[in-house]
Amino acid sequence: MTVAVGQKARRSLTLSAEHVATYARLTGDYNPLHFDAAFAAKTKFKTLVVQGGLTTGLLHALVALDLPGPGTVFLSQHWKFTAPVYVGDTITADAEVVSVHATKPVCRLRITVTRQTGETVLKIGRAHV
């Protein structure tokens, strides 16, 4: 797939309790922040939060299926979680190509993930794919 600077893509996902449970079964991430409401209530989050891997997983789908597209993998990324994600949130990943290597099939993306309120929950300062 040919990509150009300025090209954009978007992908959304509404997260459910089943997503959280399935992710835990697959990865073993049974952190009480995701399953124990009494435990979570005593933390800065005050309620159950979704595993970060579900948020970053949306990025992998975006890169592999949308921009640049099939066959693409992350070579490197640097992200920062800026807010928690909760069950019921709809998260949206937006990617934009900011540079394309002149001689290799490599590009740099700017990616942000927001929730339905418009609040940013994850920022990627740089991602090479």
Features from the language model and the residues they span:
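HotDog/MaoC-like acyl-thioester-processing domains
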Residues: M1-K8, V85-R126
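Catalytic strand-loop segment that frames the active site of acyl-thioester-processing enzymes
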Residues: M1-V50
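Short, intrinsically disordered, mixed-charge
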Residues: R25-D29, A64-P68, Q116
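Hydrophobic beta-strand-centered segment that forms part of the acyl-chain substrate-binding groove
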Residues: K42-V97
